[in-house]
């Protein structure tokens, strides 16, 4: 084998490695490490517990617990549990001013961007950190239609986060309290966190109040 052939071979291997990192490290799609049957049951159990908390809990946002019949959800779908590539902020002092549903503002720490593939699209979402909680405030093509117009929230499990990757489980996406009670002030997703796909996973939204209708109409 000539020197030229060896160099061409090495260049070819390098190109393949680059393409792999570029196109496949963004997301592996559905998390193949889970047992679909067990995962579905665990998710249904958590939803049942949340319904009970909303129905009888002292901190429930539901004004009329007597008529509460449970939250509305999309069916569990492992395809909406994805692995994302993390792009952390080198400067940990970067902050995000978040507008609240009542017009006030709060300041959160910018933690990282999550880059992943979902429904055939490359998506990018900002992760914020508040104390020890990592959250994503997002909207998607279902917002204002099948889900709350003011957006939904997704919390990340630190146990499923590494330096370069994190699991995003949109089956656990939930509505803020202000979706059910206008007495609560809730953070609204930043403009950059509007997904170009319909996330048919997590909590749906069928209740409409004057406040929620205004948020549903937001672009």
Predicted regions and their residues:
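C-terminal partner/receptor-binding element of secreted or periplasmic proteins
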Residues: 184-219
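Ser/Thr/Pro/Gly-rich low-complexity linker/stalk segments immediately outside membranes or between
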Residues: 24-41
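Acidic, glycine-rich flexible loop segments
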Residues: 140-174
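Extracytoplasmic/periplasmic/luminal assembly and interaction segments
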Residues: 46, 54-96
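Hydrophobic membrane-insertion alpha-helices, especially the h-region
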Residues: 5-22
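Mid-length scaffold segments of soluble, non-membrane domains
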Residues: 88-153
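Extracellular/lumen-exposed scaffold segments
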Residues: 67-71, 95-99, 103-110, 126, ...
């Amino acid at each position: 084998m000539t020197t030229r052939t060896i160099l061409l071979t090495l260049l070819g291997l390098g190109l393949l490695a680059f393409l792999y990192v570029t196109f496949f490290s963004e997301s592996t799609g559905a998390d193949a490490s889970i047992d679909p049957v067990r995962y579905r049951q665990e998710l249904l159990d958590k939803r049942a517990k949340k319904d009970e908390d909303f129905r009888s809990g002292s901190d429930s946002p539901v004004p009329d617990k007597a008529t509460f019949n449970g939250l509305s959800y999309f069916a569990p779908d492992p395809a909406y549990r994805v692995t994302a590539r993390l792009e952390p902020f080198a400067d940990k002092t970067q902050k995000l001013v978040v507008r609240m549903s009542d017009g006030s503002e709060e300041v959160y720490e910018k933690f990282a961007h999550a880059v992943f593939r979902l429904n055939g699209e490359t998506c990018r979402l900002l992760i914020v950190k508040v104390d020890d909680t990592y959250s994503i405030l997002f909207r998607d093509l279902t917002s204002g239609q099948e889900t709350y117009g003011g957006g939904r929230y997704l919390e990340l499990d630190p146990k499923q986060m590494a330096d370069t990757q994190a699991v995003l489980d949109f089956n656990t996406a939930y509505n803020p309290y202000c979706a059910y009670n206008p007495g609560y002030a809730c953070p609204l997703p930043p403009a950059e966190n509007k997904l170009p796909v319909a996330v048919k996973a997590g909590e749906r939204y069928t209740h409409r109040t004057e406040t929620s209708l205004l948020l549903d109409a937001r672009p």
